[in-house]
């Protein structure tokens, strides 16, 4: 009986210690092109588990003219969220996935010194780059002239919002310019691009010393980890570790082979040293969990983010019917 009692006491002590030692997981709801829903989505505003909103703002929206900054949308969202006891997280969008949307200011596309400001991204089947179709735009992150303008934007944003917003993240590191070099834009190489991401992340961290800084780093052009690891993605994570910038990515896909081999391993390595933020984006709710052969559940998404990636933040998209039918009910339990 004495042994049994000791076992019970030991078990209870473990249970009591867990809540105090477990790392809290913060839940935000993501609003992108549906930003206007921020103020009308009652399920978001009335669910306490949702601590705030991650809102995507395009560079083009924030700088309508050279050195003419318009942060009115950020101010409006910050004020509205504050009134409702919630926080704002900014996603700075300099890439798009539609031919219709060019993410950079118009002056960058017209002044020759910026070489167009942005370049087309492409999609194609297998390795058929000859028949590639346009699939959006990416700012010329590696172009010194464009980079200089981008850093000025960061400084202007930080001057007004550092310490007021919960955090800010860059869009994903992945760009789709093919793998053979035939579709590479002017001045682009995987090595130059790697160095540009490192430089931009350092600039973001210098600008924002109070709010959390995160680089979405999922894939890098010119390599495919782990079979063809050139050190490009690892260099970005190394910089994050050195500067204490956070890391994360735009897709939460438990046990998906491509992500497991590329970014997830590196994210897990830095967990506990820097902030980890992961996003559930369109299509993620319908992911088939390789462990079960069934569509992933909200509980499984959270468990993978918390237990494997050791995430601090999850950003949930509002894709229907999953957001209303699955996520909101789960968060209100």
Pin down the residues of each PLM region.
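Well-ordered, non-membrane alpha-helical segments in soluble/globular domains
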Residues: 36-40, 68-77, 146-155, 190-202, ...
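Catalytic domains of carbohydrate-active enzymes, especially glycoside hydrolases
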Residues: 33-60, 87-91, 238-248, 270, ...
């Amino acid at each position: 009986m004495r042994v049994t009692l000791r076992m019970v006491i030991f078990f209870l002590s473990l249970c009591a210690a867990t809540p105090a030692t477990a790392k809290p997981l913060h839940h935000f709801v993501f609003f992108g092109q549906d930003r206007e829903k921020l103020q009308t989505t009652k399920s978001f505003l009335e669910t306490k588990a949702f601590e705030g909103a991650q809102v995507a703002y395009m560079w083009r929206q924030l700088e309508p003219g050279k050195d003419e900054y318009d942060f009115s949308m950020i101010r409006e969202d910050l004020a509205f969220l504050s009134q409702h006891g919630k926080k704002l997280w900014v996603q700075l969008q300099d890439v798009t996935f539609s031919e219709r949307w060019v993410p950079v200011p118009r002056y960058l596309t017209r002044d020759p010194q910026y070489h167009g400001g942005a370049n087309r991204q492409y999609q194609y089947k297998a390795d058929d780059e000859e028949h590639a179709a346009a699939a959006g735009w990416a700012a010329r992150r590696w172009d010194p002239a464009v980079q200089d303008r981008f850093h000025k934007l960061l400084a202007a944003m930080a001057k007004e919002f550092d310490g007021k917003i919960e955090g800010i993240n860059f869009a994903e590191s992945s760009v789709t310019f093919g793998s053979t070099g035939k579709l590479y834009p002017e001045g682009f190489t995987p090595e130059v691009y790697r160095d540009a991401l490192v430089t931009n992340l350092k600039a973001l961290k210098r600008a924002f010393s109070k709010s959390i800084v995160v680089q979405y780093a999922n894939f890098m052009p010119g390599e495919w980890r782990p079979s063809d690891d050139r050190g490009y993605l690892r260099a970005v994570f190394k910089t994050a570790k050195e500067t204490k910038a956070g890391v994360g990515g735009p897709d939460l896909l438990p046990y998906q082979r491509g992500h497991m081999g590329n970014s997830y391993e590196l994210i897990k390595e830095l967990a506990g040293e820097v902030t980890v933020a992961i996003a559930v984006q369109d299509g993620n709710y319908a992911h088939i969990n390789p462990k079960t052969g069934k569509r992933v559940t909200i509980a499984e998404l959270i468990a993978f983010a918390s237990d494997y990636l050791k995430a601090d933040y999850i950003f949930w998209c509002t894709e229907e019917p999953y957001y209303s039918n699955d996520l909101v009910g789960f968060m209100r339990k």
